[in-house]
């Protein structure tokens, strides 16, 4: 018998984008358990997993609108990965109609919850002219204080910070460079 994933293990898989591969590797044996945890217990990580399975037809018949609904439920409970993925989907028009303003809302929430992918994508949208200049300081602050050991990502962050800085008042930049806890 295949063991059901712990919440922490599932969140780790979601963050590494291996959650759907794991369900398939487990030969789709946990579908009913996953659905129950999403539907009855309303566990955010399981709502996200179930939503992703439905959206892409992994081990179940594809039902994209139901899948997005479960992802939205997980996002509404504050799951950073769900907020980031919905933001990415709206930014790119994946499964949903492209809506970059809506993407900013989801990505801002995920970015505030320290999701680095969301922080980067949010600044990309700001640099494209979406969002509010009032949010630049927070976005700069989060990205400025981010930590990554990926050299390419580090260079991208530095480049984005330099570009965002040009759109900001010098005082806002100074304030944004404060340490994370202040």
Regions inferred by a protein language model and the residue ranges of each:
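N-terminal leader/linker segments that initiate helical-solenoid repeat arrays
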Residues: 1-39
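Short helix-capping/linker turns of helical repeat alpha-solenoids
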Residues: 5, 39-47, 56-58, 63, ...
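Hydrophobic face of amphipathic alpha-helices that form TPR/SEL1-like repeat modules
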Residues: 12-16, 49-56, 85-92, 121-128, ...
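Structural signature of tandem alpha-helical TPR/SEL1-like repeats
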Residues: 23-32, 61-70, 97-106, 133-141
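Alpha-solenoid helical repeat scaffolds
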Residues: 35-36, 72, 108, 144, ...
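Extended, hydrophobic/aromatic-rich amphipathic alpha-helical segments that build helical scaffolds
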Residues: 48, 82-84, 120, 136-141
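Alpha-helical protein-protein interaction scaffolds
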Residues: 113-117, 121, 139, 163
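Terminal, low-structured helical/coil segments at or just beyond the last alpha-helical repeat
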Residues: 153-182
